[in-house]
Every structure is written in C-alpha cells, then in structure tokens.
Amino acid sequence: MTQVAKQILVTCALPYANGSIHLGHMLEHIQADVWVRYQRMRGHEVNFICADDAHGTPIMLKAQQLGITPEQMIGEMSQEHQTDFAGFNISYDNYHSTHSEENRQLSELIYSRLKENGFIKNRTISQLYDPEKGMFLPDRFVKGTCPKCKSPDQYGDNCEVCGATYSPTELIEPKSVVSGATPVMRDSEHFFFDLPSFSEMLQAWTRSGALQEQVANKMQEWFESGLQQWDISRDAPYFGFEIPNAPGKYFYVWLDAPIGYMGSFKNLCDKRGDSVSFDEYWKKDSTAELYHFIGKDIVYFHSLFWPAMLEGSNFRKPTNLFVHGYVTVNSAKMSKSRGTFIKASTWLNHFDADSLRYYYTAKLSSRIDDIDLNLEDFVQRVNADIVNKVVNLASRNAGFINKRFDGVLASELADPELYKTFTDAAEVIGEAWESREFGKAVREIMALADLANRYVDEQAPWVVAKQEGRDADLQAICSMGINLFRVLMTYLKPVLPKLTERAEAFLNTELTWDGIQQPLLGHKVNPFKALYNRIDMKQVEALVEASKEEVKAAAAPVTGPLADDPIQETITFDDFAKVDLRVALIENAEFVEGSDKLLRLTLDLGGEKRNVFSGIRSAYPDPQALIGRHTIMVANLAPRKMRFGISEGMVMAAGPGGKDIFLLSPDAGAKPGHQVK
C-alpha cells in the first residue's frame, strides 16, 4: 500500500557535554535510529538531529578542574560523542551544540516573545550560597533529602526517585556538592517563566490521546499538585548565554537545552542553503511531525516546560514524546566496580554495533519499561537469531547457487504460497516498527526465519545435490531460501545497517520495503562471503575487564596545573585592590652568595629603585640574561629582612618550580612604574 510521504523531524535528548556516551545513552539513540530508518524506508522525508547540551555549572567547573576553557572541553567532547554515534551507525542528519550562535539567537527570541506576552516574572529569591566557594549553587550542585518522598541524596531541582521538581531551598538538610559545606541563604533577583498560565493548554494536550498512557498519568499527578512558576535564570559565574539586558544573569541550561533542537535544525537548514524549511517545520500551524525520543527522567521538562515555552512564543508544539526506561546490566544498575558501566567506545572495541542494536531492539516496546542487558542472554540471542537463523539461511543455500549455477537464481519460485506468507507479514511488522513495538516486530521476523529454515530442512538441498537429474530442483530450493533471506533482511534493515550492507552486496540488489513484492528471479547474486561471526562469553569477560580498568584509570589522581595547585579561596575585590602591582625594569641580576635558590634583582620602578631577593635561580642559571627585561612586581609588600639583606617586594613568576619557573613580563610598550590594573 502506497503511503503519503510525511515531513518528520526526530530528535534524541541532548547528551551532556561533560562525560562519555555509555550503553544507557545508546538505548535511546538506537531506538530512535531504528524508527527513523524504518520511516525512510517507507519514503517519508525525515530529518534526524541531535546536539550536545553544552551549558551549565558542571561544565564550567569540570573545565576549571582540567585547566582548560569550557569551549575547549565541549569541543573535544562533541568530537568524542559524534565518533561514538557514528560507530553505532546512528544516522543523524546533523549533530550540533547548544553553545552555538543559532541557539543563542533562538533562545533570545523565545525569551523576548515570552517577556512581551507577559509570561516572564521578576522577583527576588533567597538562594543557596556556598560560603566556602563564594558562589551561588545551581540546582545540580546541591544535594539533600527530597521534600516530597523523603528520598535521600537527591539533586536540588528534581527527584530521581519520585520525579518531583522543586526549588533547591526546599531540600531537607542540603549540602554543597562543590565543597560539602552547608549552604547559607542569600537574596538574588531571578526571572521566572509563568508555567501555571499554560495549565489549561497542557491538560488538553495531555488528554489528546497522543502521549503514552504512563506519561499522561504522571502529568495528571503534576496538574493535581499544582504547576509552579519556573526559575529560568542563574547567577554568574555560569557557562551559558547571558540574558539580554540583565548583566550577570544567565539562561538556566534547561531553557536553552530543548531550544537546541531548533538550533540544530536551523544549522542543518543553513548548511543546505534552505531558507524555507525551518519556518515550515516550526511555525504554529506546521503540518510537519515533530517527535522527541527521551528518557523517563526528563519527562517533566519536555511535557510541561517545553510545550508551554513553544506555545507562549508562537511556535508549534511536539507531535508526541516517545519515552523509554533505563538500562540495567545483569538485572542491576550499571556498576563501575563490577565493570558493567560500559562506555560506547569500549563496547565497540569488543563487539560490533549491530549486536547491541539487535538486542536492544528485541527488548524494546512502546512502554516506559526498563531494559535489562543480560550479557549471557545477549550472547545466546545474537548467536541464535542473527547467526543461526538469518545468516545461516543464506550460507546454507548460497554455496550451491554459486558453485552449481554460477550465482544465477531460478526463474520461478519453488513455493509461491510460502513467499506470500512472508510478504504478507509486511503489514504486521511495519505496524510494529511504526508503533515502536520493536520486540513484537523482532518476534514476527524470527518466526518467519524459523519457517524459512524449516522449509530448507524439509527440502534438504544437500541431499538433492547428490541426486542425478535434480539440478532444477536444487536451484529452485536454494533460490527460494535466498529469496526468503532477502525478505528477512529487508524487515531487519532498520536494525542491522552493517549486516544489511553485506547482505545487499551478496544479493546484488538494494533492499527496499516495496521491493520484496517482486522476488529475485533469474537474478545473479555475488559470491557468498561470511556475513556475520559468532560471539562468545570470552568477549564479554574482556569487555567487563576493560571497563573495570577504565574506571581505575579514571580514578587515578588528576594531574595538571589546577589539580596540582588548586585555586585558592575566593577573595573580594576590595581584598585584591590592596595589592599594588607595578611594571619594573631589571637593572641588575646576580647570584646570592651562600644561597643555591636566590637571585638578587635590582629593579627600576621609574624613579625608584628596589632590591628584591627571588627564588628563581634554578630556572635562570645565567642571571645576566635577565638584565634589561621588564617584569611585574608587588610594589607594596612590606620589606622582609633576610640574612642576605632586605627584600623590598616580590617579582611575579609562574610554574611548578625547579627549572619550570617563568618570570612574568608585560606586553611591549609597558614602562617601569606602570600600575597593573
């Protein structure tokens, strides 16, 4: 049946740019990719996009810890993420970043529209402040007991146990994640999105029947408890977009993160030179379909805040949210100590991508159920289904076709009724792919695979091959087997892209959904090559051990300037203003008799001479080389009496010590006596 081509935009939740992709992430990206590949097979116009979620205090602090800029860190992480997704053959049309000009412009546009429409409210709030670090604490940097369900060790914005959202100030016994200190309250003006104004619209959207039943039920609980205004601002220091006309205030990461879907699509349109599609997809009355694949932990943001923000800024709402559960490994939460917290890149060092794609797909449904990756069952299922049932069907027939018939298939089907049984299944299997009942689709396909192998077993081509005068029968039987293999691989094409490529090369034809209605008759196939290898538990053991070793390596002490010499406690501007830094000319430099560490420097401050002892001898074995250089000194440091004389200040140098000491110098043009400001 010919379908009307649809315009579809599909997104996955944006991975946070401060960590590697792991098998928990991959469930969502594989689920979405299988669905997208099926839609493309049916002739629909699909744009599949994602991006890194690149803002927030965690990224700012981790970059500081690594001694690099946030921009450098998120750039490196983006490359790593894209490499992982490419390794799993996730067919994104575009992968972008929320730290982009497109996202900045769209965030400011949506904010300005919300403000113009009266949906942004200002008020002063009491906020948790870390007295040791001298900074306001973002939601995720406060932990305590959930005020709703009383679960301990929950973040300051939402509870991972009951799903409730709340203010960090509502936490019971809060602690700073940064320092462990008990936060104190300080006042700060913040901006709030008036979510309650959209309650009626959101309830109507919930009752529309589009959302998963579990999502709709959860939303109803939130409506009954009452929607609250949403704090969309954060105080400096913060890595993100500064709010227009609000110095020192930044958009909360959860405001610009979902807008990143729009930013990535805008970036894709611009790359294509397409000035039309963005508005066509995102305008209020768009006929394009918009689907977000997300995990159950972020339903609140996507089912309430996001559609309300879009409604309030005159953009279209999502067609639907496709929500999935978590991944467990061997029936337990992923564990670093047990080696079951497995990174995507580590997996690909031990197994191919198709194996995990198949296993996840076989277990997925349209419900929000957790998926267990049982590693022993994984090995058994991949070998039983992919190797023994599907690939074996091709291999046990291809040899005869290649050797006895020069690769040419029979001109007629040996069993047209059986072939029709296979092609008639397209409707049921297609509906299962469409409705995300992936496990059902796989069960239907494997039932057909059993039927195909039973046919070959009953026809016994290996026996027929030994009987004189039965060449035509042999060709017909094996051609039938290969045609059934072709149908199976067509149904599995959304799941197994690499195996599909090898199957298409052997079959000498592209696998298309509608193409199976016409069997391959009198068609020449290519010489058969091994399509897929068996896997075993030794690979699993190596994978688990490698994951354990990675955890050990990650737990090793972090090295680098900031790790070796952490930043001191925060001081006020008034404290810093007391330090008088001046440019000084080194008029003379010489060794200090009786000291193997000091040099005596004679400094000219532009009308005043100073004598300074500096512990830089190990880095400057030839003091004469310093004469004539400009440097920076602390000019108002109290004179210090030493056994070699009086030191009248301090010169500024950087480095860990020893030979690695580097005297600081001002830029060209600075003159002795100039104050450093």
Swiss-Prot record:
Binding sites annotated in the UniProt record for Zn(2+): C146, C149, C159, C162
Gene: metG
Keyword list, A-Z: Aminoacyl-tRNA synthetase, ATP-binding, Cytoplasm, Ligase, Metal-binding, Nucleotide-binding, Protein biosynthesis, RNA-binding, tRNA-binding, Zinc
Top class in the EC scheme: ligase
Cofactor(s), by name: Zn(2+)
Residue intervals of the tRNA-binding domain: 575-677
Entry-linked InterPro entries: aa-tRNA-synth_I_CS, Anticodon_Met, Met-tRNA-synth_bsu_C, Met-tRNA_ligase_1, Met-tRNA_synth, Methionyl/Leucyl_tRNA_Synth, MetRS_core, MetRS_Zn
Keyword hit for Ligase: yes
Enzyme Commission number(s) from the entry: 6.1.1.10
Sequence motif 'HIGH' region, residues: 15-25
Any GO molecular function: methionine-tRNA ligase activity
Protein name per its UniProtKB record: Methionine--tRNA ligase
Organism expressing this protein natively: Shigella dysenteriae serotype 1 (strain Sd197)
Major subcellular location class: cytoplasm
Binding, ATP: K336
Residue positions of motif 'KMSKS' region: 333-337
Subunit structure: Homodimer.
Localisation: Cytoplasm
